């Protein structure tokens, strides 16, 4: 009898805890934001918050723009639920500068990364301490991609030339005037990923093209698995994240082990080569592997850490692949796809492609120009075209998200003294701001030279007429948030813009491109804009001297 009673109590407790968990998932607590802050997307219906959250999976653009037009444009914050049933307060544009200046002791991105980026559930690597290693990688990538960016231009040019010609067509096509229809997103994947690997892993990825291709395939599969897992787990309610992550980690662990099996010997080989030739100035001595080793040695000499071996550096590269590597390559692929689609579908009377081609011919007259930073700084038209495409197609429709971590909450600088309680998520309605007619007339249209025209108009009013002061594509403002804003803006944005300029310049100088139909409308999964997977263009090798 005692055993039966104990079993009954145990079963009852099990179902009680399970029922509580399910109810918590289906009926999440109402937001504790002040009552005067409006909530967008929640209807008067059964399971209202759950259903509003589910709608955000595919209908996020409509809900965000509706909330922005009703509240954001009137300089009022509003609340939106994401697909995981997490409420987030979205700030009006006049609060963005103040928001970005708040210290990490008040607003932190740590908790957001743990949940929305699924770091808490997907991080692997027992010998890697997450936070300190993340700071180290951020410093190393900042140093590599920003301070020494010009040193990368030669190898970038070499890889862009090799990859574009491989994907777009051979020299023989110049003889028969052959047009080739390609899937643009797939083509950009085949371009951008090898370029990223060339920068971070160096040229010596294998002894043959076949081995190099095998290395790239393994690494690419890991990145895809990590990226899909991050988005999928990040959009789930907290109740389900841990459970589903246990299943997702199984294939992820397999791809991770395959990649490490390839990476560790590669790292060991390059470190050994570096030790035998400390004065090597060629590309083998400039890759990210050596850069990590050098920074590790400096830290060891200063007493702040121990020197990293091949296994640990391989882990660092895996972390880079899972954060900057995946985010950088995937976002650049989407940006490049959208940019070319926008340009080939620009009204022909604007002569956008012709003007960009002439600018590339003027700034890149020989191979030496490709290695000089000044050449691409002079490409104001390309800069404007890239900036305009990022404005129209931001990677995230809302962003800059942080969590209030101060116990007393955070008081907004508004007339109503709105206080946001601890634990709340706060962000910015990026797409709403980017499509605000107050900042961008005809905001729904792609106008490739919008920013040079604005700069030229401003200079004309001041007595000038040049567009040299047009804002750079990599420079965020409170109304241009394609790369984030403030001290936490994307660290690789200058590198990304340089890569986009190189790809665009090389394509226009060596190929004709044309549209196969209207560009598809942007779709989203949660906060993330999806790439136009099926969009195609036609390409043809240009004949020497042709217009």
Swiss-Prot record:
Localization in the cell: Membrane
Cofactor: heme
Top class in the EC scheme: oxidoreductase
Principal place of residence: membrane
One Gene Ontology molecular-function label: iron ion binding
GO CC terms of this entry: membrane
Gene Ontology biological process: secondary metabolic process
Biotechnological and industrial applications of this entry: Fuscoatroside and some of its derivatives show interesting antifungal activity against Candida albicans and Aspergillus niger.
Transmembrane feature ranges: 3-23
PROSITE patterns attached to this UniProt entry: CYTOCHROME_P450 (PS00086)
Binding, heme: 490
Catalysed reactions, as listed in the record: isomotiol + reduced [NADPH--hemoprotein reductase] + O2 = 2alpha-hydroxyisomotiol + oxidized [NADPH--hemoprotein reductase] + H2O + H(+)
Residue ranges the record marks as coiled coil: none
Entry's EC annotation: 1.-.-.-
CDD domains named in the record: CYP503A1-like (cd11041)
Pathway: Secondary metabolite biosynthesis; terpenoid biosynthesis
Keyword terms: Heme, Iron, Membrane, Metal-binding, Monooxygenase, Oxidoreductase, Transmembrane, Transmembrane helix
UniProt topology in membrane: Single-pass membrane protein
Similarity field: Belongs to the cytochrome P450 family.
Known function: Cytochrome P450 monooxygenase; part of the gene cluster that mediates the biosynthesis of the enfumafungin-type antibiotic, fuscoatroside. Within the pathway, fsoD catalyzes the hydroxylation at position C2 of isomotiol to produce 2-alpha-hydroxy-isomotiol. FsoD may also hydroxylate the intermediates 3-O-(beta-D-glucopyranosyl)-isomotiol and 2-deacetoxy-fuscoatroside at the same position C2.
Name by which UniProt lists this protein: Cytochrome P450 monooxygenase fsoD
Source species: Humicola fuscoatra
């Amino acid at each position: 009898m005692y055993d039966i009673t104990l079993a009954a109590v145990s079963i009852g407790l099990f179902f009680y805890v399970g029922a509580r968990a399910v109810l918590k998932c289906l009926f999440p607590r109402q937001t504790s934001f002040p009552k005067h802050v409006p909530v967008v997307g929640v209807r008067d219906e059964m399971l209202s918050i759950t259903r509003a959250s589910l709608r955000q999976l595919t209908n996020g653009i409509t809900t965000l723009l509706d909330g922005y037009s009703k509240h954001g444009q009137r300089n009022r914050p509003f609340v939106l639920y994401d697909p995981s049933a997490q409420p987030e307060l979205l700030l009006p544009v006049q609060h963005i500068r103040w928001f970005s200046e708040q210290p990490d002791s008040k607003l932190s991105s740590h908790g957001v990364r743990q949940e929305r980026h699924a770091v808490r559930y997907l991080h692997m690597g027992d010998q890697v301490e997450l936070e300190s290693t993340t700071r180290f990688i951020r410093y190393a990538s900042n140093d590599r991609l920003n301070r020494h960016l010009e040193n990368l231009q030669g190898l970038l040019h070499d890889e862009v030339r090799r990859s574009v010609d491989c994907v777009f067509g051979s020299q023989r096509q110049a003889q028969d005037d052959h047009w080739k229809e390609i899937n643009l997103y797939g083509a950009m994947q085949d371009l951008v990923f090898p370029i990223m690997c060339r920068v971070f892993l160096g040229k010596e990825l294998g002894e043959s093209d076949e081995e190099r291709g095998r290395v790239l395939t393994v690494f690419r599969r890991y990145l895809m698995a990590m990226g899909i897992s991050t988005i999928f787990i990040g959009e789930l309610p907290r109740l389900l994240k841990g459970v589903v992550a246990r299943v997702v980690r199984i294939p992820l662990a397999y791809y991770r082990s395959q990649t490490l099996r390839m990476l560790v010997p590669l790292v060991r080989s390059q470190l050994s080569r570096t030790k035998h030739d400390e004065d090597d100035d060629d590309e083998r001595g400039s890759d990210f592997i050596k850069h990590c080793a050098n920074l590790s040695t400096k830290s060891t000499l200063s007493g702040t850490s121990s020197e990293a071996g091949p296994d640990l550096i391989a882990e660092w590269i895996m972390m880079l692949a899972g954060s900057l590597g995946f985010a950088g390559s995937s976002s650049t692929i989407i940006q490049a796809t959208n940019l070319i689609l926008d340009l080939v579908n620009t009204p022909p009377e604007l002569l956008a492609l012709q003007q960009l081609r002439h600018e590339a011919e003027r700034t890149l007259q020989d191979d030496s120009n490709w290695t000089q930073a000044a050449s691409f700084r002079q490409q104001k038209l390309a800069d404007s075209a890239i900036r305009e495409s990022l404005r129209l197609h931001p990677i995230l429709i809302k962003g800059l998200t942080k969590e209030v971590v101060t116990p007393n909450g955070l008081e907004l600088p508004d007339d109503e003294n709105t206080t946001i309680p601890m634990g709340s998520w706060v962000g910015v309605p990026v797409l709403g701001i980017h499509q605000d007619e107050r900042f961008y007339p005809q905001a729904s249209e792609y106008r490739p030279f919008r920013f040079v025209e604005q700069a030229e108009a401003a200079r004309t009013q001041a007595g000038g007429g040049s567009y040299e002061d047009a804002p750079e594509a990599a420079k965020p403002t409170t109304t241009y948030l394609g790369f984030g804003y403030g001290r936490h803006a994307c660290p690789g944005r200058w590198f990304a813009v340089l890569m986009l300029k190189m790809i665009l310049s090389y394509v226009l100088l060596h190929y004709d491109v044309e549209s196969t139909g209207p560009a598809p409308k942007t779709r989203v999964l949660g906060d993330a804009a999806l790439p136009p997977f099926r969009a195609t263009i036609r390409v043809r090798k240009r004949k020497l001297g042709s217009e």
